[in-house]
Swiss-Prot record:
GO terms for cellular component: cytosol. It comes from Buchnera aphidicola subsp. Acyrthosiphon pisum (strain APS). This is Dihydrofolate reductase. PROSITE patterns: DHFR_1, DHFR_2. NADP(+) binds at residues 7-8, 15-20, 44-47, 64-66, 96-101. Belongs to the dihydrofolate reductase family. It catalyses: (6S)-5,6,7,8-tetrahydrofolate + NADP(+) = 7,8-dihydrofolate + NADPH + H(+). Disulfide bonds: none annotated. The lineage of its organism: Bacteria, Pseudomonadati, Pseudomonadota, Gammaproteobacteria, Enterobacterales.
Length: 161
């Protein structure tokens, strides 16, 4: 079973502020879609609420919450372990947030898909300090410069262990 974390992070590891992504980067949205399409995605309740409680199309949406969620297009799980059991084992499992789920799953992940955004920004949700673990090796990295549509320099990186 392959478990991956996918996130967009600022230089100071911010991933969110007031349950929203604190930037708009269309190329990151394309990257996210490309990497998660036709896969299992697991998210926490706050991430679910941040996407306006709408299942992401062409993905198996699994939401972790202590309170049962009954909605077409999602599978509710009361724990990370039950979320993983609900996933299809022949597919990569993509953890899409939030901060608490990332922190709990970093140790179990085989791969990280990161968008590094070249800004320091105020936030209240952070990606875990993954660089503290020396076993992560970069498989792919592509730097991109800001343009009319994407107002920050950014890079895509895939790490594996």
């Amino acid at each position: 079973m392959n478990i991956s974390l996918i996130a967009a992070i600022s230089k100071n590891l911010v991933i969110g502020y007031k349950n929203k992504i604190p930037w708009y980067l269309p190329e990151d949205l394309k990257w996210f879609k490309q990497k998660t399409i036709n896969k299992n995605i697991i998210m926490g309740r706050l991430t679910w609420e941040s996407i306006k409680k709408k299942p992401l199309p062409m993905r198996k949406n699994i939401v972790i919450s202590s309170n049962e969620i009954k909605q077409e297009g999602i599978i509710w799980a009361d724990s990370i372990s039950n979320a993983i059991i609900s996933a299809q084992y022949n597919q990569e499992i993509m953890i899409i947030g939030g901060a608490k789920i990332y922190k709990e799953m970093l140790f179990y992940a085989n791969k990280l898909y990161l968008t590094h955004i070249d800004i320091d920004i105020v936030g209240d949700a952070y990606f875990p300090e993954y660089k503290l673990y020396p076993y992560w090796k970069t498989l792919f990295r592509k730097k991109n410069t800001k343009n009319k549509m994407n107002p920050y320099n950014y890079s895509f990186e895939i790490l594996s262990r």
